[in-house]
């Protein structure tokens, strides 16, 4: 997230990528020793990462086009699957807006509670999902607090993403990436993106119906996308 936020504006080319590699190395070593996975350690790491990236000198006055990337999970994140779309946009000097992996995990977990609400039932999976969602939301708030305290824009929280899905009336569409793709599109348009690249597998019917089918409704969030 911070790489996408800062790299188009950095004064020293490559400085943001160096920070990413540094923290990837540090976190890998911590995970190898079974550390950094508890809530207290994660909150400390959130703060340290944000403080580290806040030292990068940037020129925010640059005119940079903000483009969102969303779509089916594998195609969205895998350069092999999307033909290095992210690199292509970055080479064009675009500010890439892309949600991370955690919202997808929250979406999958929350699918149990959505099904319970739709069918008027109460299952053990649904109850457990609510507890897990609450835990992840707490960590998400801590992460956003660290971002804001260091002068960065907070990431869109899951509650906001879900509200977009509710507006479409499609929270029951939980096969594959379901309503999440459309919600990410709305989030991107609301947060200033003038274009959205939707990456979908050619033969994935679920992605085409849940995502492409609501493009017109997503465009209601902006008039010039």
Predicted regions and their residues:
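Residue-level signal for short, function-critical loop segments
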Residues: 73, 201-202
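Residue-level marker of alpha-helix boundaries and capping positions
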Residues: 76, 175-176, 205
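A donor-sugar binding/catalytic signature common to diverse glycosyltransferases
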Residues: 194-198
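Glycine/threonine-rich flexible loop motifs
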Residues: 204-210
